[in-house]
Amino acid sequence: MSNVDINHARALVYQLLSSLFAREIDEQRLKQLTSEQAQQFWTQLGYAPEFSASVASIQKVLNGLTSDEALLELAADYCGLFLVGTKHSASPYASLYLNREEEPLLFGQQHQQMSEFLHQSKLQVQSHFPEPADHLAVILAYMGHLACHSEDAAQLSFLNACIDSWLAKFVAKVVECDSKHSNGFYSALATLTLAWVQQDKQQLEQAMH
């Protein structure tokens, strides 16, 4: 594969992870995630030993969503984990993990920083996604953009400062809170995201030496 192809594949993974943190899975999205093309994508991603267990768990849940009730239960898991903002949830905002204040504000420093990154790239958070710019879905989508449009050094700098600096804390919180739910979909998704980011960081570092 050429560097262009590799970076395009990296961008696809970041965009996929971003989309799964951005909103609940509805029936239309489920069809996309379980299509023949998607199954091939999951299988290819799962060949890597560091991703295989998480990918298998994700595929098992997706392929088992055969009723409206099952979809609603997964949507309730998403809401309970990422939308309600209690001690039993895992809020997906960088500011809540990077700021030392006891009650950090949303739309604070990390939001402003991400907004500036987006502005510099002539991008913006879509109007139908009314969230602060330091939401994990926005950050992962932007990393996918950088994969195709920026040099390795800029990608690595952003990854270190805006993702790797807090992702492990977020993932630990997801795993802790999601253990109360039956299928563990979001635990697997979070674990896969962390493993992907760590592997991508390592490959960027190697490419620069």
UniProtKB/Swiss-Prot annotation:
Database matches in Gene3D superfamilies: 1.20.120.1820, HscB, C-terminal domain
Principal cellular location given in the protein's record: cytoplasm
InterPro entries in UniProt: Chaperone_TorD, DMSO/NO3_reduct_chaperone, HscB_C_sf, TorD-like_sf, TorD/DmsD_chaperones
UniProt keyword list: Chaperone, Cytoplasm
GO cellular component: cytoplasm
Keyword Chaperone annotated: yes
A biological process term (GO) from this entry: protein folding
Cell location: Cytoplasm
NCBIfam families: PRK04976.1
Protein role: Involved in the biogenesis of TorA. Acts on TorA before the insertion of the molybdenum cofactor and, as a result, probably favors a conformation of the apoenzyme that is competent for acquiring the cofactor.
Entry similarity comment: Belongs to the TorD/DmsD family. TorD subfamily.
HAMAP family tied to this protein: TorD
PANTHER family: CHAPERONE PROTEIN TORD (PTHR34227:SF11), CHAPERONE PROTEIN YCDY (PTHR34227)
Descriptive protein name: Chaperone protein TorD
Lineage, highest ranks first: Bacteria, Pseudomonadati, Pseudomonadota, Gammaproteobacteria, Alteromonadales
